[in-house]
Amino acid sequence: MTELKNDRYLRALLRQPVDVTPVWMMRQAGRYLPEYKATRAQAGDFMSLCKNAELACEVTLQPLRRFPLDAAILFSDILTIPDAMGLGLYFETGEGPRFTSPIKSKADIDKLPIPDPEGELGYVMNAVRTIRRELKGEVPLIGFSGSPWTLATYMVEGGSSKAFTVIKKMMYAEPMALHALLDKLAKSVTLYLNAQIKAGAQSVMIFDTWGGVLTGRDYQQFSLYYMHKIIDGLLRENEGRRVPVTLFTKGGGQWLEAMAATGCDALGLDWTTDIADARRRVGDTVALQGNMDPSMLYAQPARIEEEVASILAGFGQGEGHVFNLGHGIHQDVPPEHAGAFVEAVHRHSAQYHL
């Protein structure tokens, strides 16, 4: 494997010294870039784009050609696992992801296979290998998965949800059925992330997009417990270096201490959490990633720069910060505003690493 030319993202996750704060953006390969839209049109639809290693590689690299980002993230979707389990993923225009065969009973759960990462999910591993090759050691590659709870919400609700009543009904009326589903998903995610690491991912991230809809007690039992299980089962070293793990629960700022206790290397923060407060609470055990409001990218570059400076000052001197948005970049953000954001992070952060 090629020597890594820029490893500041990996170093920051391990709270090691860096020259400037590393930065990348969730959904950095996406619809705000005209070149992404062109490649997606060439692929035909979203899943065809994910399943074509060359095109998935192309869209992964597109933002790196425009901006001096410190990491690439695999272009894929969190719903690849439920799709590989046979639920029939499709995308409804304006509706988001849907499943033709959502989970309705314990019998449905019992029938679910644990997908083979090099079988049904082999297209993801092919994309990882292709991207690693084409990155030529410029920056590290991040692999990822949805969390068991977040995947379960889509599988039981049949798609996106606003109130999560269907899965909460299962959680409160048939908790053992939901635990059986989450257990199967935890095993699947562990295999999936380990396969991504073996294929070349140099860091992995678990996206718990919907953990924040739970009570504190339910979060511990139905989300965090299974993420902890996954972390315990992950390969933490590959190619002679540590493979850092980042845990991100959107809306989970009140549970940072419990999240840090899982043994992950870093926690993702959404924009509702104060980064200075987060660092006081858990900064001696984990790195922090975040956490500008993605909507700030609608502002003029001077205002974006102000916000970047304010978040950097909030984190303060020293190591253990990866700058990012608090969630994915919006699809109608002007690309030059994203560029102003990335450059502002590098320009304003050097003073914190003297």
From Swiss-Prot:
<comment type="subunit">
    <text>Homodimer.</text>
</comment>
<keyword id="KW-0210">Decarboxylase</keyword>
<feature type="site" description="Transition state stabilizer">
    <location>
        <position position="77"/>
    </location>
</feature>
<feature type="binding site">
    <location>
        <position position="209"/>
    </location>
    <ligand>
        <name>substrate</name>
    </ligand>
</feature>
<keyword id="KW-0456">Lyase</keyword>
<keyword id="KW-0963">Cytoplasm</keyword>
<comment type="pathway">
    <text>Porphyrin-containing compound metabolism; protoporphyrin-IX biosynthesis; coproporphyrinogen-III from 5-aminolevulinate: step 4/4.</text>
</comment>
<protein>
    <recommendedName>
        <fullName>Uroporphyrinogen decarboxylase</fullName>
        <ecNumber>4.1.1.37</ecNumber>
    </recommendedName>
</protein>
<feature type="binding site">
    <location>
        <position position="154"/>
    </location>
    <ligand>
        <name>substrate</name>
    </ligand>
</feature>
<dbReference type="InterPro" id="IPR006361">
    <property type="entry name" value="Uroporphyrinogen_deCO2ase_HemE"/>
</dbReference>
<feature type="binding site">
    <location>
        <begin position="27"/>
        <end position="31"/>
    </location>
    <ligand>
        <name>substrate</name>
    </ligand>
</feature>
<comment type="similarity">
    <text>Belongs to the uroporphyrinogen decarboxylase family.</text>
</comment>
<dbReference type="GO" id="GO:0005829">
    <property type="term" value="C:cytosol"/>
</dbReference>
<comment type="function">
    <text>Catalyzes the decarboxylation of four acetate groups of uroporphyrinogen-III to yield coproporphyrinogen-III.</text>
</comment>
<dbReference type="Pfam" id="PF01208">
    <property type="entry name" value="URO-D"/>
</dbReference>
<dbReference type="InterPro" id="IPR038071">
    <property type="entry name" value="UROD/MetE-like_sf"/>
</dbReference>
<dbReference type="GO" id="GO:0019353">
    <property type="term" value="P:protoporphyrinogen IX biosynthetic process from glutamate"/>
</dbReference>
<keyword id="KW-0627">Porphyrin biosynthesis</keyword>
<feature type="binding site">
    <location>
        <position position="327"/>
    </location>
    <ligand>
        <name>substrate</name>
    </ligand>
</feature>
<dbReference type="GO" id="GO:0004853">
    <property type="term" value="F:uroporphyrinogen decarboxylase activity"/>
</dbReference>
<dbReference type="InterPro" id="IPR000257">
    <property type="entry name" value="Uroporphyrinogen_deCOase"/>
</dbReference>
<feature type="binding site">
    <location>
        <position position="77"/>
    </location>
    <ligand>
        <name>substrate</name>
    </ligand>
</feature>
